[in-house]
């Protein structure tokens, strides 16, 4: 039971949880009120860094959501890696209550990763996509070798982006690849002829919600727990 509890918390949260629980012990030694405040902070840390198991639909042509959150926009834009190419950008906003663990959206190979320094304006603003600190992931899809781009974007509160994959690595849809601490945004850039299956304003679940299909939608889906 303890193993399952720890396993369902992202390792980036361990230090915050340990410090806050230690502060709770010290707080209770000083006063009950201070101890309760520190304990509440500890529980909030556990909630924020939770990493639940997800039922991931299987299929190399599926594009699943890389994050929990709200779809802010779906629009055609210039590719962030090639101004001469148009792509579809799906922007997902994560508030502080969402699960912040990020997941691979499509099975394939990591073609490149890039850290881009920047500012920390609110991730709910469209200009944050170009101005804020972000980590870029380019995935070559397994089914047709097309490039799928994922940008982890820091927000007003988020000041730490973690990306745990490297160039040349083989990845599968739904696998965990990183986390953004606190409020943030994830942009997903897809080829123009991708079949989009979500809409602006929709709430999505990382690893579970199918955002798009690289080919026609399958008649039947199978799922796996990750």
From Swiss-Prot:
This protein's UniProt keywords: Cell membrane, Decarboxylase, Lipid biosynthesis, Lipid metabolism, Lyase, Membrane, Phospholipid biosynthesis, Phospholipid metabolism, Pyruvate, Zymogen
Cofactor needs: pyruvate
Chief place of localization: membrane
EC number: 4.1.1.65
Positions of the catalytic residues: 184 (schiff-base intermediate with substrate)
InterPro entries given in the database record: PS_Dcarbxylase, PSD-A
Known catalytic reactions: a 1,2-diacyl-sn-glycero-3-phospho-L-serine + H(+) = a 1,2-diacyl-sn-glycero-3-phosphoethanolamine + CO2
Enzyme class: lyase
Similarity comment: Belongs to the phosphatidylserine decarboxylase family. PSD-A subfamily.
HAMAP family attached to this UniProt entry: PS_decarb_PSD_A
UniProt subunit comment: Heterodimer of a large membrane-associated beta subunit and a small pyruvoyl-containing alpha subunit.
Name of protein: Phosphatidylserine decarboxylase proenzyme
UniProt lineage: Bacteria, Pseudomonadati, Pseudomonadota, Alphaproteobacteria, Rickettsiales
């Amino acid at each position: 039971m303890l193993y399952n509890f720890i396993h369902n918390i992202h390792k980036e949260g361990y230090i915050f949880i340990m410090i806050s629980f230690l502060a709770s012990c010290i707080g209770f030694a000083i006063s009950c009120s201070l101890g309760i405040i520190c304990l509440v902070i500890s529980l909030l840390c556990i909630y924020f860094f939770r990493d639940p198991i997800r039922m991931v639909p299987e299929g190399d042509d599926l594009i699943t959501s890389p994050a929990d959150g709200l779809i802010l926009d779906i629009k055609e834009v210039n590719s962030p890696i090639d101004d001469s190419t148009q792509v579809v950008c799906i922007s997902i906003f994560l508030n502080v209550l969402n699960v912040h663990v990020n997941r691979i959206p499509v099975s394939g190979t990591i073609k490149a990763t890039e850290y881009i320094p920047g500012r920390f304006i609110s991730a709910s603003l469209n200009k944050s996509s170009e101005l804020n600190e972000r980590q870029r992931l380019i995935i070559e899809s397994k089914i047709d070798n097309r490039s799928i781009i994922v940008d982890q974007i820091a927000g007003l509160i988020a000041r730490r982006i973690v990306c745990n994959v490297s160039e040349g690595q083989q990845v599968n849809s739904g696998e965990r690849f990183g986390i953004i601490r606190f409020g943030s945004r994830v942009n997903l850039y897809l080829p123009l002829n991708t079949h989009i299956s979500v809409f602006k304003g929709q709430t999505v679940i990382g690893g579970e919600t199918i955002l798009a299909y690289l080919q026609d939608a399958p008649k039947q889906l199978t799922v796996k727990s990750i």
